[in-house]
Curated annotation (Swiss-Prot):
Similarity annotation: Belongs to the universal ribosomal protein uL23 family.
Assembly and interaction partners: Part of the 50S ribosomal subunit. Contacts protein L29, and trigger factor when it is bound to the ribosome.
GO CC term, one of those recorded: ribonucleoprotein complex
Residues in the signal sequence: none
InterPro entries the UniProt entry points to: Nucleotide-bd_a/b_plait_sf, Ribosomal_uL23-like, Ribosomal_uL23/eL15/eS24_sf, Ribosomal_uL23_CS
Name of the molecule in the record: Large ribosomal subunit protein uL23
Function field: One of the early assembly proteins it binds 23S rRNA. One of the proteins that surrounds the polypeptide exit tunnel on the outside of the ribosome. Forms the main docking site for trigger factor binding to the ribosome.
Pfam families: Ribosomal_L23
Species annotation: Methylobacterium sp. (strain 4-46)
GO biological process: translation
Length: 98
């Protein structure tokens, strides 16, 4: 399996937080993904880029916060995340990068 350049557009970055680290013990990895990416696209991108077998993909959209900037109210962008469950025995080390 080879990675297609469009797969790099689907996966934006890994999420490295305390919650994401706790999920890694359950064989799950969290990524920030493109807002228009679908579950099948995310599954294919992870399988091709990291050469692992994906069991399932769950997605969520975190709404952007309202912030003040120079007295004006602004809105941060929404962020889409994907929680990717890997098959047994499969691992991804997200700290090394692509």
């Amino acid at each position: 399996m080879s990675a297609d350049p469009r797969h790099y557009d689907v996966i934006v970055a890994p999420v490295i937080t305390e919650k994401a680290t706790n999920l890694s013990e359950l064989n799950k990895v969290v990524f920030r993904v493109a807002p228009k990416a679908t579950k099948p696209q995310i599954k294919e991108a992870v399988e091709r880029l990291f050469e692992v077998k994906v069991k399932s993909v769950n997605t969520l959209i975190t709404k952007g916060k309202t912030k003040m900037f120079r007295g004006q109210r602004g809105q941060r962008s929404d962020v889409k995340k994907a929680i990717v469950t890997l098959e047994e025995g499969q691992t991804i080390d997200v700290t090394t990068g692509l």
